[in-house]
């Protein structure tokens, strides 16, 4: 019965009076589902919190609770959510900054618009995790001050703060101009030198695998450099020297930056690490000359990532299509192709090129229809979900290529109800096609009834509003709890049946 209640709680057609009745009897799981409804009134939200206090934070985040509804002493999570939305009472911050739970003070440190005195208190918190959280979110001036904090973990958080001044980020990256850190999370609790094992036997240990300290807080310093390299506010002149750094992860992060000078990009293109070259290959900052050179990279992932670069020349992309498993997603450069380029690719002799083009969903009708009649099944599968294809063309695609294109045809938004029903009658059944039919907004009862027996398509069909109401009601007692829950969530479930379900509770 519980799964039926979960479905009912999510049903968008549940009348307001039945929402009230369900709130009154909801267990914790059902209350959580109810809290996610888009149609809750303020009064219902207050009643739901009274029924299950754990929903307060979710409801506050949804804007359904006000400061008048919340006591920060009993609902600190909800109070913190309202503070972060700048909808809470500022005095709450002065109360919560003294909260004995570290996680609550950490959450407070992440809130926007805190009073200055609260930020001062957080910056001096006895638990470094609170100070580090503040450092990640705080203002430029306070970030500059916290960059000199004696604990390396705080400095690492400053390095990730995009509001930190560029000069401060440069200093954190290079270490120049800052006093040495005195502590890190490793030497806080372990005698040094220490390297945390990959498989730690202590259940209460929260150090990450491989974290280490030899007295120089080496793993935290390395992490600080990683954060600074990832931070777009770190100035270019500070990062370029890391192109030859012995740490491969640092070169990974450098290779993804959008501000790389040409000579640094060229050096990274010859990096011994394929991961570095792959991150560089997808970087929109590299020019056409380097892209052409990298197209011959021996590593498959480098070439695959290069194909996703939005500035890859189409002739290079065509070459990559024949040598690299690129995948089925629409590539940025293909999406940006001009009408002239689209026409050239449609006439390409290479089916891989035509397949990439067929992923677009805005093709001219004559090109779309030509691709739908392509002799290569991969091209047809790629274009099959394109809007505007006629029923006759979709049926012809199935007739020529069968199971290879069935699911793609079923996903076409213009597929007719009759075609969808015919697709479900294919033998042997194509499960992916059944799932596509069960999701399709144009599916009607004959198609949906055929989908119900399938393990994965069945729950989708049970929740489809075109399913006949008597069938939906019957599914409420189905042995598969997923189908029963989906049926309870079906907006076509008659209100009288909804009321009967609640009457037996």
Predicted regions and their residues:
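Alpha-helical scaffold segments
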Residues: 1-505
